[in-house]
Structure formats: structure tokens, C-alpha cells
């Protein structure tokens, strides 16, 4: 029977008028045409693909030991895996499919069979989520497979590796020759107990599998899954099942203890009820009375079917007419009969009120469906629907009054209400019923019951299978949101489901603590399946039984009690065995040096602690697994079997230590496991993973991490002038003479000197100094040095005057100050333009022509001032200007005559020679035209050009600059002598802190050195500690590169005395005079307080200098110099070690990973490296050699190195903060996660579409042949993303990956738009994407694997990073000057000294379905903005910070 959709149209309208306005999309007498109440898989008008609406909560996939055992068994032979519901059969199938895909030849497929469409959708979701790297397809009857051709099948299976279908689909394909049994590599039979009699399962095996096997032709491997292989307690049925499936039934009996621990048993209660109809306040069901009356009033001669037959003139139609009238078998008659019968059953089962609501609701849905979809009176089939609708209208049936009491409810319903209200725990419940309609009606009753609804949030779940071409029964009250309810139940938003037997088996739901069998289970198997849903501790199971059927119930109850008793006896047997065996184990592990010891009693707890310290990654199981094996050797019947235990450690443990067996046999599983744990811990100690205190090595490393002190007292700065003065006092020292040229900002040479100093000067970069915020000067010191034979100290005064103009220059600039000016300055300047003398200062009286004589400018001096202060000359004034026009008047201004010549001058600067451009003056320009006024008659003019005075003023900067090079040269000569660094300029950069305000500081080169250090240490540790897990390697690396360790290295090497931290102070500055230095040499060594980070930064800067000077080899030498215990080896050597350690050698790449090499455009020489790189640490499957942890450890450093090298080499050179921003933007987990999701391979595939799909012309209202038309193939491109190749076995990771995939599909376009053309880096979008770290870990593991395979160079890795999009995005960020600063950091800068507060709250969504985050931003206690609707806490902060930045910048 057909059922129809909901509608809000008025029922009083004429149906023919309504119908004639709508063109029917499908024949309403055919398959269901209503899409409003159908799931996508049920709708024949749509694609039967449960894709977007698949449940997000995937079956738990953490492999337990007994599941791994079942996998091993299935790899050896065909098996039927018999395990309780909820114990993880599906995971065994997933592991088996993965193993098959690795070996499966091209052209074969894995065929996964499930008995129902619901299970097809369930298992499709699981396979798709767990094995996303291959094409997986689901095919059911809804795909119209009965009309598929050979071409259709070939297209549908193109590039498909796993196909999930109902058994009838496969059987039909085999029967018609579209699929050959030899093309199947593996067949998985879900709910394999159905394989009996004439079931499609059985026919596939008997008619095709066994026929081919008998002929010795290839046949697929078999894996059956079941929770109850014995049907109706018939043991012989097990033998038949094994024979039919050519498989042996296997249950993990070797792990019975663990299996029982993972399968909780609920307490069992029976509820006896009276099935008789209960009295109803509104009388016996009024609606049912009206419905039966309407049925009795039907006139068969008015039936549309009869009318249409009477209009035909043929013998066939006459025979049909006679039969229809005689038997009253028409659509209308059958529907009314069924409606009345089912309404009566509803009244008996649930009560009269329930029957009234059922009748009114069914009629409402039927009528509303016609309004929604329409029908045409041109077809007699539509005429039947219109006729039936008018019958319902004429019956005038109204909904019952609201349910306020138990009146009108059956005793059975009243009992379930009592059970629910009396249940005193936080419930997670399933109520099993028999009929589809009962689920809807009972759910409605419980939902509208005030007390029940306050305690339970109730949903429904029914089966969705149907046969295409058969009318759907609207009397089933089709529920609209089964999959949504199931998802809400999984997420905890609903805590009770009313469901049919569809939830008995197969479909994965969370563990429950309350199971209600509203209808008695049909057999023991159904009971076992339902009981398996109650896996929580202290669960309850209620069985409802009619008081008239107690005898039948007692027989079933006896079976169930027997089952319980068997399980209880098993528990008791295990306990008795453990108590009976004496623990005679003399062996112990003792460490003589520490006195530590370990016995068998402590071994399991120690081993558990060791595993928990291996890593702190999410989604990784942190506990050992134990396998129990019965030893058959020497076993006699009747003897207690002897056992051995094998402990399995996580894949991050070296393979040789990962599986350890007990040293002897035991009767008790417990003792065998303790023995295995002891042997395992002993092996770990011998391998060096446990220290001499018998504690995990990680614990000791964490304790040994050096704590960086707050500040540290170190040596004072090395003074090179003291060393030079000491050398000069000991004998003649040759002078180093160099040309010093001074030029302006236009590169015009202003003057030239000879710089003389009694020490060899290294090559010096040009010194750029700023005179003020507008003008700069450049001092170039030629690199070609001329060494004089003698020191001018011993020359006469005339010679000194001729060869040393330093004192004159100082007098020009500083003579008016309190500076002591003498002739014994170590650094001397000699003018190339002729001799300079003190007599030339203020030599002549002022005359206008003298100030700018010979094209030069000269200083003027005030002779009335005892210090003879110098001034810049500006103009001549014929008379004294008013005092109001002068910014500052001199003393005695008012007494001087008005009618006299005056000079307008500017004051000589107190401070200049800045290494960095100073800020422009902040004060507003003065309105007074004259800065200073001097009388012309008391003013004199220098006869030395102004540029020499400027040079004198720059002497502090020149001495400071020279001192930097002398300090660096001494550092190179002493501490860094083994490195033979040729570029002293870079050493100057490396030893200067930012606080010194020198021309350059170490921040840029330290940025490079930091990455070089971590890369060198990382690859060396990985190569020299092959047996250590990544977690321990990370701690060892952190210990070697920590600021505390580097600080200690700096002090141990006496590097601290070469670190420049204080800037040049010109106030009180004195030149380095020989006489003063002789006195200082007698003073004790000075001390200073420095930050340990500053000392550590200098070490990293020197490593960077070494790299620039001599590449990685010299950088390794520098690391060896400062951190001798690291003993770094050349990159070629460590790469060869790592490459040689890859196992197994020469392996063939698994078939499912061959596509990955094409995707990344790199073919591995050692395929084992690629397999290791794609293996997540949760993948604890037998045979796994290693996981990607160690490769990720390497790849993280290599990726950082590649990015740092790229940004460091950019021209023009970037500032340190710019490089930090770019590195942060390019190697964070968010962008790497996004890029690995975006990076995909487009594989060709075909979708099977209806012939009339998308073709409105073929959908005529009366045409019923369109369903028979042949389907068509539509070519598609199936994306296979890079992340899908990661092998993992974690339920939580799979769920997180599926949820992240949905977010990625939502955010992909806006993120790509921002990356391609946005002005800002998409921090907020990435925060919403919230890619977990395993995405970036996978990316980095691939980088590490490529380097080990292709190294020791980085070209292959750099090419991979470029293909990923990281390097192109770097160019885009630079080209378009994208704003990269993180919003939270930017907000902190905009706020200045005001405090920024993020007030984050977790709230319910507006629809009450789930939670979201909101954030309010306050700056300085003031509200700025707020955001809502965020998925994550950090996202709310980032979004709020982004908005706050925009608001503050506008202000």
C-alpha cells in the first residue's frame, strides 16, 4: 500500500482540483514516492546513497587483544567470527579488509554482505570512515539493480575496492553473469547465522562458491560475523553453517577472561501484564467505530478498480471483474480491511486512546501526502487514492483529546510507564517493539506523558528496507528522523529509543543500561542480541510477558537462565584456577648499583606505567594487551590445560621488544600474564628503556631537564682596548693603517682619513650612522691594511701632530664639554686633506664670507662663552631682533645694542651618530623664527670645515663600532678557533643583543641557528638511538637544546664575556686613552647579570653563523664545540644509518599505497619508509613494524628547516619578527591539516542514475513504465585525499576525522578564497576547522620519510613541501603583503598596557541540540565586542579578537 506525505493544506478542498495542479514525479502506486518521510536510501526517486546523512558516531575501533587474535585466525583460514554483540566484530572485519586490500590484485573486489538495507548503510559508513583511501560503494534494491546491464555493473565497479550490498543484489548479479565469483577476493557475511535454508546467503555459497571450488577454480576468502551462530539452540545448525560457508566457527576462547570483562550482563526482570482491552473515558475507540462503519458502507461497484474493469471490453478484464467483485480484493477494500485490523490490534496492544491517535495520524499522513505530491485522475491508480481519501474525509475522524491520565492506555503501556518512572539511574534505554507503527505510537505516548517526558528524551528507529516496485504501507506511520534520532542517541541528546528488531543486531549504538523487550523475543538468538545492548555496569533488562502465555515464557526463561548459569560457572572456574595455583617464581630483576628490584607481583603495574609514559598523543591506547595460548604438548584428556601468555606493547616500542611471552606454562591466566609482564619489563631494562632504578627512561629524563634560572651572574664584557694597551706597553707594536672615507646619503664623499690602530683589524662592513632623523652618513673602512713599522708613540710632537688628528677632531666636536682630550688615544685618525691643529678652532673673527668659504661650511663659536660653544651659522641680521622672536636669548641680551650686526645660529647637537634612525621630533614647530642669536662682534669662525667637526662628533660611534669587531675577532681567535670562521661581520651580528642598539643584532641569525640546531640534534638522535621511541627522543632533544643547557654551554666556553648587551652612551663618554687603560688593567674583573635566554640565543646565533660560513658541516662542528655530549655526525652518515634501519628490506609496496606515491609524486626506494610514514601509533595490528612517530620527529625538524631557510634567504632581508610570523603561519597544525585535506587524487568512477533522473519530460503523470527504464552511467571524479591513506585503529580518531571532514567541506571554499586573494591570514577559519594534530603529524612524517629515503640533501623534501602548497603560499603572503599577525597578539598590541580579557562561556544552541561557545572581549575592563555560535573555545577567542581588532583600529 502506498503512503503519502504531510501537508498543511486544508482537507476541505476538492482533491481533483488540487491533484490536477501538480505533476506527479512518480507513479504513486509503485514504489514509495514520498520524500519527506523517507531516508535518502529509501527514496527510489533519489540516489540511494547514505552519504551526507551518515551517523557521525562510528563503531568503536580500538583493537583489543581478542580482536587481533580473530584477525590472525581469519588470515590463516576461513572463519565465522562468533563474538557477543558490542564486543567488536565489525572491527575484526575492518582489519581483515585492510589486510586483504594490501595484497589484493588489480581487478578484484571485497564484497561485504549484510542482510538488511539498514545494516548496509551502517557498514558502508564504517568502511568509508575506516578505509577512506579506496573507493567504497553501497548497492541495494533501491538502486533498481534488476534493470542493470553488464555495462552498468562494469561502470559501477570501476576502481571500487569494497562494495557493500544485500545478499540478493550479489545473487542476482551472479545469476545474470554480471559478476564472476572469481573476481571476489574476500566475502564478508555480516550476521552470518542467516546463511541457512534458501536464504540468499546460502544460495550464493551453494550455487556459485561451492560450484567453483569443486571445479578447482579461484574462490574468495570467507569471513562470517555473528553474535549467535546457534539458531533455536540447535547445535547441528552450527555444523550446517560451517559447512555452507566453508569456514570454521571461531570464538576468542583464549581471551575468555577479557571478553567476559568487555561484555557486561544485565539483571533480568519479567513484567506480567493482562492483554485485555481497558475501559476508556471517551468510550470504546470512537475513531475505530467510525472507521469500521466507513468500511461497511463501501460499495464494491463504485470502486475505481471495478469501474475501470467494467469500461474495458475483453475476456481478461471480465475475469478480473468477476474475481474482484466476488472476493472484494481491490486496493480500496484491502486498505480498509488492513486499516481496521491494525487499529484493533493497536487498541489491544496500547489502548483505545492509542488506537484513536493511530487512526487520526494515519489518515492525516495519507491526506497530506496527496496535497504534497499530487495525483492525476487520468490514472485509475490515482483514482483509487482519490476515492480512498474521500472515504476518510466522509468518516469525519478527529484526533483524540490530549493524554492527561492513564485512561485509554493498555495495562502493558501502564507497566512500561511504571518501569521508566521507577528507574533511578541516568538512563540510556532501548525499548524493543515488534511493529513499525507501534514505535511511533508508543513513542508519542511516552513523549506526551508529562512525568516520562521530563525524565526521558525519546526517539524512534525502525528498519528502512523495502522492495522496489511495491507500495509502502502508510499504516506504518513512517517515522521521519530515524537516522537523526540514532545520531542524537549516540551523542547523548536523546537517552531512549523505541525501536523495532532493526537495533537487535548489526547497527552500532552506545552501551545501554536499560533494555525493555515490550514484545517477547522470538527466540534465544533475539534475546542474546537484545541483551548484548546492555553493556553498561548494573544494567537492567525487562521482558514483558502476557499472563496467558506464561508457559511459553517459562520455556524461554529456562533457556536464558541456563545461559546465565553457564557464564557464572565460567567466572567461578577462572577464579578457582587462579586461587589454586601457587605462585612459585624465584626469578627477580635486581640492579646492584642502586638496589632496585622487580618481582613478578609488581611487573604488570610497572609495565602499565611504562606504556603510559611512551607518548602523550591523543587517540592512542596506553595499555599492554595480553594473549593467552593453550599449550597442547603433553596434554592429556581430563587435565587442566596449561597456558602461556604473550604481552603486546604499543607499536611505538621497538619491534623486537613489542611481543614477549611468559617463560613457562601456567594453569592460571592471571599468573601467565604476570610472568609475561615480568619478562617484558626485563627486556625493556636490558634494552635501555628502563633505568637502573627500574623506572621508565622518560621519567628520569623529565627529572633531569635543566631548570633555567631567572637571571645569571656572568663575566663582564671583554674590553679589547685593555689587551691592546697591554701589548703596547710590552714593546713596539706595528700600526694597522686603513683608509676611512666619509660620504653622505647621496654617496658623495665628504672627507677621507687614515685610521691607525696598534692591532690587526678584521674586514669591517661600512658603518651607517644617522646624524638626525633626516640625514645619514656612511663611514667606509678599506679592507686593505698597511702595517707601519713602528708605533707613533715614540715619535716627537711634530710627528704626532702630523700623524694623529684625533685630538683636534675631538676638540672640534667636544671641546666645549667636560671631555678630557689627550694625544694618547689608541684609535687615531689622520686627515688626508692636510694637517689639522687646535689653533684652527675659532681662529678668525666673523665675516660673512668666511662661514662658507671654499665651498665648505664652518662652525661659529661664541667667544664670550668660556667653553667657546660651537654653533651652525644660518644668517646675518642687520639689527637685534625682538626677544619675542627668539626661542632662547643669551644672558645680557637686553643690555646689548640694538643697532648692531647679529647672527642667527643653531645649536651644535649634544648627541648624534645613531646606529638606528631616530624618531622625528614629536613637538610642534615653534612660531619664533630664530633659535639662537649671537652678536657678530663676539663670534669667531673655525678654519677647519664643518665635516671634520661632524667626524669628531662621530668618534664615540666609530670607537664603539671598531670595538665590536675587535671583540668578535677575539672571540674567533679564542673560543671559535676550531671553526675558522672567516666572516667576522657575522660574528659581530651574532654577539650583539637587541638591547645594545648596534647596527645589527643576533635575532635574525639566531632564528636560523635555532632551526639548524634542532634539525641537527633531531636527526642525530634518531640515527644514534634507533631503539628509542619518539617520546623519549623528544625529551632527549629538549634537554640538549633547552635554554638552560645552552646557557651553561655559553658560560662553560666563556662565551659570556663576548656578549654585547648595553648600548653606547655618549654622555660622559671618554676615548680609550693609553694612560687610562693602564690604570684599568689593575682593577678586578667586572661582573654583570644577564638573562639565560640571552646567553642561549648567542649560542644559537653562532650556530647560524657557522652554517652561513660553511654550511651544515661547520654548523655541526659548532654544535660539537658547545654541546660536546651530542657528538653530531654528518648528515650523510645519519641518513645512511636511518635508511639502513628501515625494515623490511626491499618490501613490495601494498597495493592500496601505490596510489599514494602517484599523489605525492615521489617514488620511494625503500617502500618500508612509506608504510611507516602512513602508520598512526594506534595501528596495533600484528605485523606492523613501526609507526610514524620517529619519522614525524624527523620531519618536524626538516620542515621547519626548509621554511626557515626560505624566509632567511629572502631579499631584501626580513626582520626577525617578520620571519617568525611567516614561519608560524606556514608550519602550524591548522594550515598543514588543511593542506593535507585539500591534497587529493581524482579517481574516475561511475554513479548509476535512473534513466529519468533529472529529466522532467519523462515524468508523465500516468506513466508507470519509467521505473522499468534502463539506468544510465554518469562519470564522476572521486577524490581520494592524502589523509585517507593514514592507517589507524582508533574509534575516537575515526569519529574526529569524519567530523573534521564535514567541517572541511563547509569551510573549504572560504579558506581557499582567503589563501588565494584575502588580505588577512585566515586564523579564525582555521580555528573553526580545528584540525587535530594527527593531520600535521602525518604531513611531517611524510617529509621525514622522504628525507631518509632521498637525503642527505633537502631537494626532494623541498619539492614535496612546494607541491603541498606551503611554499607557493609563502610567495603569496610576501607578494601581496598579507596581514599575518595573529588576532590575539594584534589585540594585545593595540591594547597597549591595558589588560585584555576573554570571557568565554559554553551555551546551548538555539534549537537546544548541542552546545556552542561564546566569547566577550574586554580591554581595560571595557566591553569591546562579543561573538556567539562557535564550535570551539579557541575559535571563540580568535573570532572575538578579530572583531575587537577591527573595532579598535577604526577608533
Swiss-Prot record:
GO MF annotations, alphabetized: ATP binding; helicase activity; metal ion binding; ribonuclease III activity; RNA binding
Organism the protein comes from: Cryphonectria parasitica (Chestnut blight fungus)
Residue ranges constituting the Helicase C-terminal domain according to the UniProt record: 412-582
Gene: DCL-2
Keyword annotations of the record: Antiviral defense, Antiviral protein, ATP-binding, Helicase, Hydrolase, Magnesium, Manganese, Metal-binding, Nucleotide-binding, Repeat, RNA-binding
Protein's name according to its UniProt entry: Dicer-like protein 2
Gene3D superfamilies: Dicer dimerisation domain, P-loop containing nucleotide triphosphate hydrolases, Ribonuclease III domain
Keyword Cell membrane: no
Stretches assigned to the Dicer dsRNA-binding fold domain: 603-704
Pfam family, one: Dicer_dimer
Chain segments carrying region Disordered: 34-53, 1253-1272
Family: Belongs to the helicase family. Dicer subfamily.
Record InterPro entries: DEAD/DEAH_box_helicase_dom, Dicer_dimer_sf, Dicer_dimerisation_dom, Helicase_ATP-bd, Helicase_C-like, P-loop_NTPase, RNase_III_dom, RNase_III_sf
Motif DEAH box boundaries: 190-193
Domain RNase III per the UniProt entry, residue ranges: 968-1111, 1153-1351
Site (Important for activity): 1333
Keyword Cell membrane among record annotations: no
Cofactor(s) demanded: Mg(2+); Mn(2+)
